[in-house]
């Protein structure tokens, strides 16, 4: 029952205003479909008839229109994928007393009941062939439910309760049509809630990602979108590489003959390249490894054994005396020699100014076991630093032990000067740059020497050493031009301007003379043999024997060329002429190389080295044996007899000694 004071409906027991929806659902679950046109028409006719009977005035039209509006405002049933079902709309009998009532409230109540009865829910049944009616939003717009009253025709109450179109759509979308009218208070609360500004939803865990995707998509579609940097172009495949094929079971069995041949050829090429690389590596190393292994294997013998039991003790003593002579004559600088010899002229009214004695800085390329340490200790000008370099590690260890023995006083033979400071390093002096040695860097080395260097460096630059010595070693550098130039670059880089380069090596003039003599004798023998056999026909298959080897020597030394040297003895090109040298108790068939002297001297000019001295060993003895310093030194070293003055060497040792010569270059 509708209560005007509360503007709401109240239910009572037995009241027919109870919802017809519940009664239809409980009493008649299965209904027969009735078209909506008939339903609206029937309800419209009954309502119009009742209104005409009770109110023949125009106000009756308002009630009928309200009923039609309420029926149209009901939402359409949603469609599904199942076939449309048949539903029946059943009207409950209308109470005549309610229609004849003159009270407007009862009239309104009766109209509301009729509208509720007409909007009974339609239940789905299977097997229906009639389509379910759908509401057309274009033809029937959604409108709020308004119950007509007698005063609506003047526009007083209906206008006040009517909602805005936006509110009507929002209200119908938010909740379904109620079974009964909503109270005014509830409608006001719903209106305020809808008009209230909706708060921002709290961000979720994926809000930032979704926002970035949305913004990035919008930016890409915009006109000002700027693309990222382009990726680098893909690398083109190697022409030799074939596209990778898929691996399938049994694919190897389907390999063709062409693929097998290609694989075999590639394998052979790889093996050939490995062999060539190994050969190049061995050739680049040359005889350095062989020489190092040989000198590492030579046992260390004492001084007493060399003087008493050695078979070549005379040759050993003579070689040491020649090296001492070279050190005594050319290790001091010009100022020291002028002061020592008294050849420098001073002012008449003044004496010799007191000058602090300058000490030498010496680097020895191929120091060996340190056999020359005592010779440098007896040098006329004292030595401040001695640096010994040698590729044989064992020899470096033995040289360091010998130096430590000299420092401790063992083997002191009345030396005049205090022992100098010495440093020993294992280093290939001819195949590598000496600038990598720490002590050489500290003293100083010039990397700009030689061809291609700066003019200012060659004029004013230079290293920090006074003397560079190389005793019986430079013939290992003539394996190739690169090694020879590297050796001279190390020498010139270490020397300061005015420095001396001392050394001894095999005499190429002796080698050339020997080769020419041997070739001449061989030609004479061949001519004699050809003359003797000219009358006799050679037997079938007989070949004249000619090994082509050139060698000479005696019981204590031997020189052998593995290949035929030039007949005239002139070695062209000047590098790579290898021979094997044997020396009793010293050298066991070690490969060495010819040092063509004129080619070597021309090469030194490229490194600002000027030749000052060069003599064979026997000529040095002839010129220096009567020197007041070197003559007595030869007697003390056992080279000459103290009584007779005879050279204490055999003829074989003299022949072996004649194979070498000494030299000295100045750095200009």
Swiss-Prot record:
Q: What class of enzyme is it?
A: transferase
Where does the record place Polar residues bias?
Answer: 44-65, 100-129, 148-157
Annotated Low complexity bias? 73-88
- In this chain, S-adenosyl-L-methionine is annotated as bound at 323, 366, 390, 428, 471-473, 476
Composition-biased stretches (Basic and acidic residues): 1-19, 133-142, 257-279
Classify the source by domain of life.
Eukaryota
Q: Name one GO biological process term.
A: 7-methylguanosine mRNA capping
Enzyme Commission number = 2.1.1.56
Its annotated compartments are: Nucleus
Query: Known Gene3D superfamilies for this protein?
Result: Vaccinia Virus protein VP39 (3.40.50.150)
Keyword S-adenosyl-L-methionine listed = yes
What GO MF annotations does this protein's record show?
mRNA 5'-cap (guanine-N7-)-methyltransferase activity; RNA binding
Site feature mRNA cap binding: at which residues? 369, 375, 402, 475, 592, 660
GO cellular component terms attached to this protein's record: nucleus
Q: Where is the mRNA cap 0 methyltransferase domain?
A: 310-668
Q: Enumerate the residue ranges of region (Disordered).
A: 1-281, 524-547
- Please tell me whether the keyword Zinc is annotated for this protein: no
Q: Which PROSITE patterns match?
A: RNA_CAP0_MT
Q: Where is the composition biased (Acidic residues)?
A: 537-547
Residues where mRNA binds: 319-320
Q: Which UniProt keywords apply?
A: Methyltransferase, mRNA capping, mRNA processing, Nucleus, RNA-binding, S-adenosyl-L-methionine, Transferase
Catalysed reactions listed for this entry:
a 5'-end (5'-triphosphoguanosine)-ribonucleoside in mRNA + S-adenosyl-L-methionine = a 5'-end (N(7)-methyl 5'-triphosphoguanosine)-ribonucleoside in mRNA + S-adenosyl-L-homocysteine
Q: Which family does it belong to?
A: Belongs to the class I-like SAM-binding methyltransferase superfamily. mRNA cap 0 methyltransferase family.
Q: What does this protein do?
A: Responsible for methylating the 5'-cap structure of mRNAs.
Name of the molecule in the record: mRNA cap guanine-N(7) methyltransferase
């Amino acid at each position: 029952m509708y209560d005007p004071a509360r503007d709401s409906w109240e239910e009572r027991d037995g009241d027919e205003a109870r919802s017809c929806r519940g009664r239809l659902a409980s009493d008649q679950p299965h209904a027969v479909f009735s078209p909506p046109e008939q339903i609206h028409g029937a309800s419209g006719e009954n309502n119009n008839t009742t209104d005409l009977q009770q109110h023949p005035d125009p106000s009756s039209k308002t009630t009928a229109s309200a009923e039609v509006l309420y029926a149209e405002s009901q939402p359409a049933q949603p469609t599904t994928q199942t076939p449309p079902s048949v539903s029946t709309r059943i009207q409950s009998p209308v109470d005549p007393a309610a229609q004849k009532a003159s009270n407007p409230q009862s009239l309104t109540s009766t109209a509301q009941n009729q509208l509720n009865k007409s909007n009974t829910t339609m239940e789905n049944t299977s097997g229906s062939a009639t389509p379910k009616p759908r509401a057309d939003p274009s033809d029937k717009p959604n409108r709020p439910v308004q119950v007509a009253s007698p005063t609506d025709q003047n526009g007083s109450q209906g206008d006040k309760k009517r909602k805005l179109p936006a509110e009507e759509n929002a209200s119908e979308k938010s909740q379904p049509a109620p079974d009964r009218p909503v109270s005014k208070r509830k409608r006001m609360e719903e209106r305020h809630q809808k008009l209230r500004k909706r708060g921002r939803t709290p961000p979720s865990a994926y809000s930032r990602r979704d926002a970035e995707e949305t913004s990035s998509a919008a930016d890409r579609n915009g006109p000002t979108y700027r693309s990222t940097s382009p990726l680098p172009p893909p690398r083109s495949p190697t022409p030799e590489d074939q596209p990778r094929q898929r691996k399938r079971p049994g694919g190897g069995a389907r390999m063709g003959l062409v693929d097998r041949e290609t694989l075999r050829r590639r394998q052979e090429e790889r093996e050939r390249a490995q062999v060539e690389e190994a050969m190049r590596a061995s050739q680049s190393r040359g005889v350095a490894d062989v020489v190092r292994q040989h000198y590492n294997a030579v046992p260390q013998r004492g001084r007493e054994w060399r003087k008493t039991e050695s078979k070549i003790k005379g040759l050993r003593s003579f070689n040491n005396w020649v090296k001492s002579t070279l050190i005594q004559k050319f290790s001091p600088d010009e100022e020291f020699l002028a002061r020592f010899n008294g050849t420098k002229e001073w002012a008449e009214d003044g004496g010799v100014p007191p000058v602090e004695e300058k000490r030498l800085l010496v680097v020895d390329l191929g120091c060996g076991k340190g056999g020359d340490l005592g010779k440098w200790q007896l040098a006329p000008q004292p030595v401040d630093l001695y640096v010994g370099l040698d590729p044989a590690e064992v020899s470096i260890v033995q040289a360091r032990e010998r130096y430590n023995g000299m420092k401790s006083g063992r083997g002191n033979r009345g030396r005049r000067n205090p022992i100098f400071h010495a440093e020993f390093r294992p280093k290939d002096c001819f195949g590598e740059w000496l600038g990598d040695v720490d002590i050489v860097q500290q003293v100083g080395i010039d990397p700009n020497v030689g061809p291609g260097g700066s003019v200012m460096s060659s004029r004013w630059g230079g290293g920090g050493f006074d003397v560079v010595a190389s005793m019986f070693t430079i013939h290992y550098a003539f394996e190739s031009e690169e090694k020879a130039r590297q050796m001279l670059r190390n020498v010139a880089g270490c020397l300061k301007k005015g420095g001396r380069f001392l050394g001894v090596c095999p005499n190429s003039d002796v080698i050339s003379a020997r080769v020419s003599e041997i070739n001449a004798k061989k030609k004479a023998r061949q001519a004699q043999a050809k003359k003797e056999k000219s009358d006799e026909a050679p037997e079938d298959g007989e070949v004249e024997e000619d090994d082509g080897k050139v060698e000479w020597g005696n019981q204590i030394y031997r020189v052998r060329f593995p290949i035929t040297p030039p007949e005239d003895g002139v070695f062209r090109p000047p590098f790579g002429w290898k021979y094997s040298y044997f020396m009793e108790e010293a050298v066991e068939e070690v490969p060495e190389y010819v040092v063509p002297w004129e080619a070597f001297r021309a090469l030194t000019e490229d490194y600002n080295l000027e030749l000052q001295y060069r003599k064979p060993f026997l000529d040095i003895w002839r010129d220096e044996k009567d020197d007041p310093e070197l003559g007595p030194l030869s007697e003390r070293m056992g080279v000459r007899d103290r009584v007779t003055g005879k050279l204490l060497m055999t003829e074989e040792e003299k022949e072996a000694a004649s194979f070498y010569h000494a030299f000295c270059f100045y750095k200009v």
